[in-house]
Amino acid sequence: MVASGFLLIASFMVVLFVLSRPLGGFLARLIEGEPFSALQKVEAGLWRCSGVKNAEMNGWQYALAILCFNLLGIVLLFVLLMTQGSLPLNPEHLPGMSWHLALNTAVSFVTNTNWQAYSGENTLSYLSQMAGLTVQNFLSAATGIAVAFALIRAFARHSATTLGNAWVDLVRITLYVLLPIALIIALIFVSQGVLQNLDGYLHITTLEGVQQTLPMGPVASQEAIKVLGTNGGGFFGANSAHPFENPTAFSNFVQMLAIFLIPCALCFAFGQVVGDNRQGHALIWAMSLIFIVAVVVVMYAELAGNPHLSPLGADSNSNMEGKESRFGILATSLYAVVTTAASCGAVNAMHDSFTALGGMIPLWLMQIGEVVFGGVGSGLYGMLLFVLLTVFIAGLMIGRTPEYLGKKIDVFDMKMTALAILVTPTIVLLGTALALCTEAGRAGILNPGAHGFSEVLYAFSSAANNNGSAFAGLSVNTPFYNLLLAAAMFIGRFGVILPVLAIASSLVAKKRQPAGNGTLPTGGPLFIGLLIGTVLLVGALTFIPALALGPVAEHLQVWLAH
């Protein structure tokens, strides 16, 4: 099993790098604004029809465009979800959502969180799934990538005032990147048996004579962008554990690759655009080392399982509870780490059924800001925030003004960096405390003790960091949780994006200075180690007390009792 686990990790990383490197080169061309003659007429037609000017924007114009675009998306999706009962493509005649669930879902999908307090096959019409959720899967992913584009340009340009055009970036990312790759992935999924139809649900009689309903729907098209855009919201309640959504080991492997594909490619693109590939490689090394260690720990924890099973006559202690036998423990563990390292949140097993240690690693990966490859766009700009913090700390140690890629990092930059890094931990800890201190919050906890605390902590960690996965033992479809988690998702998304664009606006105006004797090299092993240490230190200082009350306490209860 040990050899199989390392072989799985190695094969995954090799295929990921082989696919993401050429995509990184293509993304670099988009960032630098190189024209693509084949689609220039399509672009020109879009600008004429929409009346949008494609002139470059400064930082605040870019931020305003992104914010207004997403607020409009929330309103439109909210209305669609509320009125779906009166709209077509609803063969099961499902009614509209309650207002608080519709608001939660709209905010969730627009912010790329895809937190789901409902089961899709019992709640949403095909129109809501296609025109609502799938569309926002594309647009929310494009938003994250566009913000990353703006920040990369800020490092690459100097003595400038503009970061690009938000509308141009959103259109090009959607047309040139997301749609073509999603189409290829969708065809692969269909070949593996993922559903893609508009038929009504099938009502069948099993061999045992039991009546059963089989849900149908346009699953493959939504599934493709669900993983490619690190969205994570499943067509069905069981998400990628459902055989109609993720039927084979191959489809499972493709899903994991798709989740990391664009985040990894953006690192390659970053190095190419700033003119030093070592910078992108350093980020990839830091991310990969943390990722591999996390996967190994989860695999070990799930294989070790529960020591109390053997005395009861079980053949193995290994923890198969909540997992699909077609994937097994190793592939399930890898998927869990991939989906929480990225801001995806898709699951092929029930994370609530993981061991205490196995569940703590996905929880911790979210809490450090999902900077280990991370979401599309958000993973890169999240890690670059830690890069700025790292060079600041290094500058303090040697008594020099911090700089990165020839740009001086001043007081304003560090204030915005601190704000962006601290906003999500603040939301997580305050939200968890509020839920535990109120009767409405405690009413949703179905498991007592340390695990119940972990479920609440996981919910707010997932929402604030725009992941969307859950410890499903928490009952969250209530006005209290729907509204509080919606606020956490919105602030967690734009409370980071706005400071990032403020940093970009500051950096793009600065002159690039040549490296001196005292300049910290940021492309070598020393800096990679410092960066990893900074990520671990911030995560440890922020969340160790909370983790000690939840998964750590639960782990000790199991093993010390044994």
Swiss-Prot record:
It is found in: Cell inner membrane. InterPro entries: KdpA (IPR004623). The keyword Transmembrane applies. Keywords: Cell inner membrane, Cell membrane, Ion transport, Membrane, Potassium, Potassium transport, Transmembrane, Transmembrane helix, Transport. The chain crosses the membrane at residues 6-26, 62-82, 132-152, 175-195, 253-273, 283-303, 327-347, 356-376, 379-399, 416-436, 483-503, 526-546. One of its GO terms (cellular component) is plasma membrane. One of its GO terms (molecular function) is potassium ion binding. It is a multi-pass membrane protein. The keyword Nucleus does not apply. It holds the Pfam family KdpA. Part of the high-affinity ATP-driven potassium transport (or Kdp) system, which catalyzes the hydrolysis of ATP coupled with the electrogenic transport of potassium into the cytoplasm. This subunit binds the periplasmic potassium ions and delivers the ions to the membrane domain of KdpB through an intramembrane tunnel. Belongs to the KdpA family. The system is composed of three essential subunits: KdpA, KdpB and KdpC. This is Potassium-transporting ATPase potassium-binding subunit. It comes from Yersinia pseudotuberculosis serotype IB (strain PB1/+).
